[in-house]
Structure formats: C-alpha cells, structure tokens
Amino acid sequence: MRMNFSTVLLGSSVALAAVSGAQAADAIVAAEPEPMDYVRVCDAFGIGYFYIPGTETCLKINGYARFQVSFGPDEVNKRQGWGAQGTSDWDAFSRAYIAFSAKSDTELGTLTGFFASEFNADNDSDVGDSLINLDEAYIQLGGFKAGFFYSWWDKGLNGETDSLANITEFNSIAYLYEGGAFQAGVAINELEGATTKANGIGVQGIVSATVGGVSIDLLGGYDTEVEEGAIRALVSAELGPGVFQIAGVWASDPNVYFAASEWTVATSYRYNATEKLAITPGLHYWGDYGFVSDADQWRGGLAVDYKITSGLASRVSVQYTSRDIGADTEDFVSGFVRLQRDF
C-alpha cells in the first residue's frame, strides 16, 4: 500500500507540472512598447515650424494677444459702427489672433496652406464680445496663390500716420515671380459687395526691385465695376540708424483701391534709438480730398514702439489731422496705447 501511494503521489506531481508548463506556454506576454515618434523641429521654412508626426509636412502656430485703448472723435462709433448708440471719444478693446501655416516641398515648389483668424472684444455684450473675423485663408504653390488674403495695397509706411489704400483684402487669384532682387506679379480680385454694381473684377499689377538698402514698389490697380484705377509708388531706404520711406498715390476717381483723394503723398522715418526703442514720426498730405477741387487734408504724428521684454511690446500713437473742405474745416487728435504679447 505504501508503494502504491508513493507511485500515485509521484504521478500526480508529474501531471501537475505538465499542466503548469502548458499554462505557462499559453500565458499572454506584454509586447515591447514601440518607440514614440516625438515632434521634430523643421528648419526648412524658418523658425517655429515642426513636422506633423507621421508626415513630411511642417506646421507653424503663432499669434498674439492684444489690449488697446484708442482715442479720437466718436472713436466708439468708428470702431463698432454703432452710429447714434455710442458717442464716446475713447474705446478699449482686446484681440486674440492665431495663425496656422502648413508647408511641404513638392516637385512644383513649396506648397503652403495658411489660415488666420481674429477674435475681438469691445465690451461684455452679445455684440461686442462676438466679433470673430477670418483674417486670411489661402493655398499657395510656388508663386501661385488663391484664397482670401491681403493684397499688395495693404503694404504701408512705418508708423501710424499714413493711409495709402481703400479696400486691401479680397478673394483673389495671384501670381508673383521672384527673381532675387526683382519681383513682378499680377492678381485678379473679386469685387462683389465693394460697390453697388455687379459682375466686376479688380486687376492689380506690381513690380518691385531692391538694390542695396533701397527698395522700390510700383503698384497699379483697375476697378472694372466703376472703370477707374489708381497707381502707387513706395520707396524704402536704410538711412543712418533707421529706415526712411516715402510714397505717393494718384487715382483717376474713387475706386476699390484708393478713394480718399485724387492724389496723396506720405513719408515717415523709423529711428531705432536702441534695441528696444523705436520712434517713428510721419507726415501725410491729401490733395483734392474727397475728389473735391481745392479741398485738402494733412496729418502729422508720432508712433513710439518699446520692447518691454521678449515677446511683450507696447506702441503709443498720437496723430493730429487737419481737414479743409470749403466751409467744412475740422481739426482733431487721435491715437492709441497698445500692449501686445506675441507668440
């Protein structure tokens, strides 16, 4: 009996060991973690781009947060379009701006997709804090560009004194040839809503050249809805510790590109006092203002920029304007104080 019991015990132990071994063979083993595809810096298109994981597309996200207090006659009306509802001569508002730029190399050149939007708040009301604006949205391949974007008329002088254009943003198709120091381009703009007429387009053309520290832009635009046009020249030159600029515009009659006067000339000088401080005085004169003979307007002012710290800057603008349209004369001071955090 003792012999049989030992035999049974030994057999049971062998069986248990076999079952245990079989269970161990069938056990689930955790897989080794796959290496993470960390975000990589993309330096092919400038600072701030990174590769979208798993692609060869580079993405940049940037923007700013701004607080500004503006002052001038009926400033609230001008900014918000409230008409008789508001008569304050000062206005505080805040803005958030964010932009996304996606770029990749192709056999046809650099492919870009760009989107930017503004979120504005003038006060705590359903009207004032819901001012969302699509700033730009376009596709660009090499020199070809299509979408909603700022035209070449949007370029102005340094400072805050000049006003050298009328409407500057359109749904457009444009092509810009860039040959080093020389550029030439043409654009077709949709004008729907710009006038009371229909089915018209705007055509722009630009030629630019840079020689040393001097650059020259020659720009023209023709509005087919009103059959009028405008031409503009703008010169920038590095001069001493700053940049001198001068520009002139002539228009055949009011049109989508320029509608303030028959002719105008403006100038400014940005003086870089230190690495943080820049001072920009400016002058602007409009002849035949409002396309009325012998009517004129002039403006003189100063803009001061100060870099408080990395990513945080301020700007103060003070402008004096004098307008003379026959018996209608007006003199006023306007400007703003701005604080902006860029990222």
Swiss-Prot record:
The keyword Transport applies. It comes from the Bacteria. Keywords: Cell outer membrane, Ion transport, Membrane, Plasmid, Porin, Signal, Transmembrane, Transmembrane beta strand, Transport. One of its GO terms (cellular component) is pore complex. It is a peripheral membrane protein. One of its GO terms (molecular function) is porin activity. The keyword Membrane applies. It is found in: Cell outer membrane. Residues 1-17 form the signal peptide. One of its GO terms (biological process) is monoatomic ion transport. Its main location: membrane. It holds the Pfam family Porin_2. InterPro entries: Porin_alphabac. May act as an outer membrane pore. Belongs to the alphaproteobacteria porin family. This is Putative outer membrane protein y4fJ. The lineage of its organism: Bacteria, Pseudomonadati, Pseudomonadota, Alphaproteobacteria, Hyphomicrobiales.
